[in-house]
């Protein structure tokens, strides 16, 4: 029979282990994020902190960031993008670490003139270097209703999903000499800003400021992630996303999205890589 002291000791060990590996579930713009720029152009629109808007005019855009940093996690939010003529605007949802050799995982939505589709720009940076761009046109109008955009980031891969459909997988290819973002904690950021010099048709379409202010909406922000605190990450291998891989169905969905809706893939850009595609593309 195990003694009372033995049971207490075992319970204490389990408790300390669980505390070390505690995950965060965030879901309120009031308590989990800070509108860190925009001079009033970013607004939380309800009392519970479920709905937030970002606006852009000729003088400034706006943005918010999470209070906490994370090293691995599943981060998702629902977004409804700027309607009508959104040329020159960029609406974002991304993870990023500080410093000059930062890591970053991007969802960027490049606006367009009325009647033409948004371009979804995805990228992965490691130690300040990106060049991993894949771009898509969406199979729906992202300005009519909210859709769920999600980043799954674990030690082996980054998966981008839309409404639960995986559209891109960036695998850890360190064995091939390809850096992977796994050492630097990142915050969640979102922003609406102007980039008319490149965002729409390479800068050919300029922002029509008579349509300002431009406004995008965010809601149902959720994080299941490993919090970085005091130089350590409370990362648990018990989360399904921590070991998540794409099964046969998931891989087929990625192929479907890329076959039907991808408009740019760095892996097939022979002008940029005349000596052959980067090793992670094989």
From Swiss-Prot:
Glycans are attached at residues 112, 238. Contains at least one intrachain disulfide bond essential for its enzymatic activity. Xyloglucan binds at residues 108, 121-123, 131-133, 197-198, 202, 272. GO terms for molecular function: hydrolase activity, hydrolyzing O-glycosyl compounds; polysaccharide binding; xyloglucan:xyloglucosyl transferase activity. The active site is at residues 104, 108. It comes from the Eukaryota. Residues 1-26 form the signal peptide. Disulfide bonds join 226-235, 267-281. Residues 27-218 form the GH16 domain. One of its GO terms (biological process) is cell wall organization. Belongs to the glycosyl hydrolase 16 family. XTH group 2 subfamily. Catalyzes xyloglucan endohydrolysis (XEH). Cleaves and religates xyloglucan polymers, an essential constituent of the primary cell wall, and thereby participates in cell wall construction of growing tissues. Involved in cell proliferation in the tissue reunion process of wounded inflorescence stems. Maybe a downstream target of NAC071 as a consequence of auxin action in wounded stems. This is Xyloglucan endotransglucosylase/hydrolase protein 20.
């Amino acid at each position: 029979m195990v003694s009372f002291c033995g049971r207490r000791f075992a319970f204490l060990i389990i408790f300390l282990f669980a505390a070390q590996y505690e995950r965060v579930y965030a879901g309120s713009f009031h308590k989990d994020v800070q509108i860190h720029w925009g001079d009033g152009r970013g607004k939380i629109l309800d009392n519970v902190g479920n709905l937030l808007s970002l606006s852009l005019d000729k003088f400034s855009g706006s943005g918010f960031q999470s209070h906490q940093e994370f090293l691995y996690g599943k981060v998702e939010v629902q977004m409804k993008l700027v309607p009508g003529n959104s040329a020159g605007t960029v609406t974002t949802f991304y993870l990023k670490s500080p410093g000059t050799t930062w890591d970053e995982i991007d969802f960027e939505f490049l606006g367009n003139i009325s009647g033409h589709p948004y371009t979804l720009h995805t990228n992965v940076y490691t130690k300040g270097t990106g060049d991993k761009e894949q771009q898509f046109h969406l199979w729906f109008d992202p300005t009519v209703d909210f859709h769920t955009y999600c980043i799954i980031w674990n030690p082996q891969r980054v998966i981008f999903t839309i409404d639960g459909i995986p559209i891109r997988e960036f695998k850890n290819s360190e064995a091939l000499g390809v850096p992977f973002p796994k050492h630097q904690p990142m915050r969640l950021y979102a922003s609406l800003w102007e980039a008319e010099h490149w965002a729409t048709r390479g800068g050919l379409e300029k922002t029509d400021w008579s349509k300002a202010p431009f406004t995008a909406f965010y809601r149902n922000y959720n994080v299941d992630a490993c919090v970085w605190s005091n130089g350590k990450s409370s990362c648990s291998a018990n989360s399904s996303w921590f070991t998540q891989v794409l099964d046969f169905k998931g891989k087929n969905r990625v192929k479907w999205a890329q076959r039907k809706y991808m408009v740019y893939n760095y892996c097939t850009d022979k002008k940029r890589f005349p000596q052959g595609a980067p090793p992670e593309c094989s």
